[in-house]
Structure formats: structure tokens, C-alpha cells
UniProtKB/Swiss-Prot annotation:
It comes from Homo sapiens. This is C-C motif chemokine 19. GO terms for cellular component: extracellular region; extracellular space. Interacts with TNFAIP6 (via Link domain). InterPro entries: Chemokine_b/g/d (IPR039809), Chemokine_CC_CS (IPR000827), Chemokine_CC_DCCL (IPR034133), Chemokine_IL8-like_dom (IPR001811), Interleukin_8-like_sf (IPR036048). One of its GO terms (biological process) is dendritic cell chemotaxis. Disulfide bonds join 29-55, 30-71. The keyword Membrane does not apply.
Length: 98
């Protein structure tokens, strides 16, 4: 199991992933999105880049624990699961600090 996890991480870090490009004056936009699921445990936070923001490709931009930004399609179930997990974690932390 550990070997499978190590191999999965190796493939993830060595394969090219869609990244941000500075083509929009207002904000950086994604040129494409990855269809390959990103492991949720490597994601620190996220934000949306949508057509209404001036981007041609709607995307959720995940920031990894190492600071890498990965573009993902907002309508995919795996993307929604990661966002829900991040929101639950954020809500728990806010309750603890209150």
C-alpha cells in the first residue's frame, strides 16, 4: 500500500499539470484544467476563476501544501469533494478560535 502511495505521488509530481498564465489584466486565468483527480490531502486552499471574472476557462485553482497552483474543472465531483472538505476544516478552525 505504501509503495502504491509513493508511486502515485511520484507520478503526480512528475506529470505536467495545467497551471496559471498571466493573460488577463484583472487576474491570472487557467488556460486549461486537469481531468486527473488531485489528492485532496495535498491541497491547502482554493479559489475560483470564472468566466464572469474575465477568464475563458472556468476553473477552481487549488494551492498545494508546497505552494503549487493546479487548475481543476469546477463541475467535477472530485473537485466538489475537496472544496467541501476544505470548507469543513475551515469552519472547525473558526469555531475553535471563537
Amino acid at each position: 500500500m505504501a509503495l502504491l502511495l509513493a508511486l502515485s505521488l511520484l507520478v503526480l509530481w512528475t506529470s505536467p499539470a495545467p497551471t496559471l498564465s498571466g493573460t488577463n489584466d484583472a487576474e491570472d486565468c487557467c488556460l486549461s484544467v486537469t481531468q486527473k483527480p488531485i489528492p485532496g490531502y495535498i491541497v491547502r486552499n482554493f479559489h475560483y476563476l470564472l468566466i464572469k471574472d474575465g477568464c475563458r476557462v472556468p476553473a477552481v485553482v487549488f494551492t498545494t501544501l508546497r505552494g503549487r497552483q493546479l487548475c481543476a474543472p469546477p463541475d467535477q465531483p472530485w473537485v466538489e469533494r475537496i472544496i467541501q472538505r476544505l470548507q469543513r476544516t475551515s469552519a472547525k478552525m473558526k469555531r475553535r478560535s471563537s
